[in-house]
Amino acid sequence: MKALQRVAEEFESWGNRTSFLPKSRDLFMLYLAFFFAPLLISQQSRGRSLPVSAFHARSDGMHTMITAHSGCEGRPDNSLEYVQYALHCGADALEVDVHPKDDGFYISHDPSDGAHPDLKDVFSLIRGSGVKVNCDLKHPGIEHAVLTLAQACGVDEQLIFSGSVSLEAIQDPAIRCRTFWNIESAMPALYAQCEAGIPLTEEQIRAAISLYRRCGVQIVNLYYGLCTQERIALLRENGILTSVWTVNDASCARQFLDAGVYNITTRQPVMV
């Protein structure tokens, strides 16, 4: 708009002397906007990334949640700078890694004695934004305490759990309904097997599904390398939705969207 105003100032006197341009400056601005705004927008958009919301739509007409992974787009991991960025990048949710401390919780991928942002400050930033926060719990047994803090901060409706959510905690509907349950929380041996590069068998997948169904799990959180269309479909047939992490490639994201996953976690919530 500033560019159009500058153009208007340059041509205002000339425009007043022509017969084919509007005499009113306001009308002249509209004239310029109509003819030149598309060109300006096109020029300014070159080299910019497209918001990941452009990828939300799936082939079935539904929409997939997009979660900004901690430290997305080059921001410092588990920082308030990252949180503020993630709130305005078009993602539906943002992820932070959560550890307990004597007087609450801090956000950091690894345990630390140093200074780290307080989870309460994260909750204060997201309150009322409509953006959800995925608390990736890095310590067992803190599910209910984090939920209590979220309730006190008025963000419990925005809260999601992933990470170390125990089999015992998942029995509580208040925890279960907001959890993307990691397969390693249910069956730790499977994660170690994957880390070693040993493919999961279909028998193992079906055993995991049986456990999910017994526990009433609604959404599972899987490493994207484990997710095939067949497995996503098998989970769906059993009433279980799929969240995948961490997808940083647009073409890969499109494949998961077309497969109908519930959530994609990515370090690139703005994809080129």
Task: Label each residue range with its predicted role.
Residues A3-V272:
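Phosphate-group recognition and catalysis centered on beta-loop-alpha active-site segments
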